[in-house]
Amino acid sequence: MVTSEQVLAAFRRRLQSNKKLAGLLRSADGYGKANDFAKTCGKELAQVIAGVASEFAGLDAKAIYGILEPSLKENYAEVAKFCKTAQKAIYREAGLGLGALEPAYSEVIARNAYRVAEGIAEATEPLTLEGLANLVAHAGMTVVDTSIDTNAEAAANMGLETHIVRTYDGVGLHNGKNPCKWCMDRAGDWTDYQSAYDAGCFERHPGCGCKIDYHVGKTRTWSNRAGTWR
């Protein structure tokens, strides 16, 4: 039986050799590339899981999670590191000497990590590589959402201006690629944190590809054309 240590070691090797991840981290000037980073990490872990998936046959979600938990927490840590770098860049852009808050390993993040094991255990047929990658990517994108939520709330509590945008991804992967009313209801553009929170901006269902972006400043002039905070 494959061990959690073996899976984690294989995942770390793939992370270290992935040039795209290194490039995304170097160019993290905000949250615009955060979902891409989370998806890329998800693909790397999915490759590792696919290589040992046959050993999960007959195991329940709890047993599978016991093997994958260290790697799923490593995935969280990688995405959280990107988010912290992105948040620092946002404060720098706004001329604010503030420290970025790292997204905590919350109940929501932990639950979505566990859903990876549930998805594997409950599948009637072996999951495809794409299916595995989507499961892990969802867990990673939840980290991005939590980071934006945490830092936007902190900025609002300090009396800073915030601008939050949630963009609908165009399809609902969970419902046969038909328009997703749940996501469309949560898409929008808000100039204060509380309105975004009340609208469900930071929520995400499995298969959701919506993108959330966030900027902060003492005073703001948002240009839709430039897409930057001035």
Indicate residue ranges for each PLM-predicted region.
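Domain-core detector
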Residues: 1-205, 213-230
